[in-house]
């Protein structure tokens, strides 16, 4: 019907200027990457992994800041990838300000990141968590080299969740 078609066109035009940002936070091994991949498969939205730009194994706090400062900014959004082999900045990854985004990684749900996402359009924040031992096992199974860094990273996660993280819209805790 013509009326339904007109409503669809109006909504599509409106959406073209208001992208959706989904911020998915949680500690290592909680299921953020799996969840973001499942959501992207259903929506075709671009996924940005904080793992791509944390500046090294001591860079959780800086990586968290980069979400608002670079990834979600309304002019020239993107980020400098981190070259984990060279332990130095890599190439620039450009983003389209109009794209719906799924931003996943520990450090993604902060007051600054939520505010930056709201500047772009609609934002939904998610926290995923589970038992530490199971998370550790999952994280190391995915990336065996991570075992030597798990406790270093976990200390940064604890500090982040105690001091910087914002309350998420949705909390998914598995056991």
Where does each model-flagged region fall?
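Hydrophobic positions on the alpha1 helix immediately C-terminal to the Walker A/P-loop
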Residues: 35
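ATP-dependent NMP and nucleoside kinases share a basic, alpha-helical "lid"
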Residues: 92, 98-142
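Small-molecule kinase domains that catalyze NTP-dependent phosphoryl transfer to phosphate-bearing small molecules
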Residues: 143-175
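Conserved lysine of the Walker
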Residues: 32
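P-loop (Walker A) phosphate-binding loop of NTP-binding proteins
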Residues: 27
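Short, small-residue-biased leader/transition segments that mark boundaries at the very start
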Residues: 1-8
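Conserved nucleotide-sensing/catalytic segment adjacent to the nucleotide-binding pocket
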Residues: 54-103
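Hydrophobic anchor at the beta1->P-loop junction of P-loop NTPases
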Residues: 24
